């Protein structure tokens, strides 16, 4: 199997490269590599045709949620137009496109987990561009797997877990929102289960193409996640100035940001668990423990 991976230097791409480099003929591309800059659509398409992959994995994205509010064209280029070109290639050649999307395609209303079939209504530019990317991929008519996920973190790259660990070294108190609820999702978890789905489709189950919500089991608020990070880092032996009890909960209303954040980021993972033949995934905190341990040590 020949695979092109875009976004090799991001937290998800990093995990995919580790997972796949000994399992297939892999071309992993970062922004500085020929064909790896998603702002250069012509170069991207040329690289795809020269390598002729069976699978295209797009682990690249414009994820600066607040910055996207004032850089809409740049966000759209990366999150919608580049995936559209990948989808066009896959439609022409029969390759499989694997793409990652977000809980931000939903409005954030209510408290029930969002299913794959529910109406999308993104509330910020980032969510709008990610939703447009989904639509363009589907319109291309290619074989595709689109994985919506939430609150991604990992050993590599910038993320909430690493930010909290850094702040906890010097801060004596911290305010974190407690009315946004979702499932923190580790990059290794995403790479592992996405790879399982790729193998299933490549075995002939093209009827399983489509959108899947890929998150671990359970839910937590950002404030609860922050407290969990600090407490468990201390349990692992990290010397931190910040105590979990000194992390104060505040409402989203009292922490205004340029981009609206959804309060309900819960995603139902029932569909993908059914396809994979499992009744449960690991809980978000079990997944987080594995990554946190590596970051602390």
Where are these regions (language model features)?
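Catalytic helix-loop patch of NAD(P)-dependent Rossmann-fold dehydrogenases
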Residues: 77, 82-85, 105-147, 151-152
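Amphipathic terminal alpha-helices
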Residues: 282-297
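N-terminal Rossmann NAD(P)H-binding glycine-rich loop of SDR-like oxidoreductase domains
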Residues: 3-21
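NAD(P)-cofactor binding segment of oxidoreductase domains
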Residues: 70-98
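SDR active-site strand-loop-helix element
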Residues: 6, 29, 59-60, 97-102, ...
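NAD(P)H-binding glycine-rich loop region in Rossmannoid oxidoreductase-like domains
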Residues: 38-78
């Amino acid at each position: 199997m020949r695979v092109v991976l875009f976004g090799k230097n991001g937290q998800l791409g990093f995990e995919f490269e580790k997972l796949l480099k000994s399992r297939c003929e892999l071309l992993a591309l970062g922004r500085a590599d020929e064909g790896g800059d998603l702002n250069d659509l012509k170069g991207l398409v040329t690289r795809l045709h020269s390598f002729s992959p069976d699978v295209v994995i797009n682990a690249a994205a414009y994820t600066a949620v607040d910055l996207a509010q004032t850089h809409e064209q740049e966000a759209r280029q990366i999150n919608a137009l580049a995936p559209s070109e990948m989808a066009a290639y896959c439609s022409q050649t029969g390759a499989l496109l694997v793409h990652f999307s977000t809980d931000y395609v939903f409005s954030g209303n209510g408290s029930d987990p969002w299913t794959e079939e529910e109406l999308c209504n993104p509330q910020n530019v980032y969510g709008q561009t990610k939703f447009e990317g989904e639509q363009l991929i589907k319109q291309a008519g290619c074989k595709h797997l689109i994985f919506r996920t939430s609150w991604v973190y990992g050993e590599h790259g910038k993320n909430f877990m690493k930010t909290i660990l850094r702040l906890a070294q010097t801060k004596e108190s911290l305010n974190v929102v407690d009315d946004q609820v979702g499932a923190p999702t580790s990059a290794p978890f995403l790479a592992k289960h996405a790879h399982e789905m790729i193998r299933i489709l490549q075995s002939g189950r093209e009827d399983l193409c489509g959108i899947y919500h890929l998150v671990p089991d359970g839910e937590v608020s950002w404030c609860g996640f922050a407290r969990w990070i600090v407490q468990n880092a201390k349990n692992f032996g990290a010397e931190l100035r910040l105590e979990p009890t000194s992390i104060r909960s505040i409402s989203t209303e009292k922490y205004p940001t340029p981009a609206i954040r959804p309060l309900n980021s819960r995603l139902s993972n029932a569909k993908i668990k059914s396809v994979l033949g499992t009744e449960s995934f690991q809980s978000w905190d079990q997944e987080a423990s594995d990554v946190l341990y590596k970051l602390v040590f």
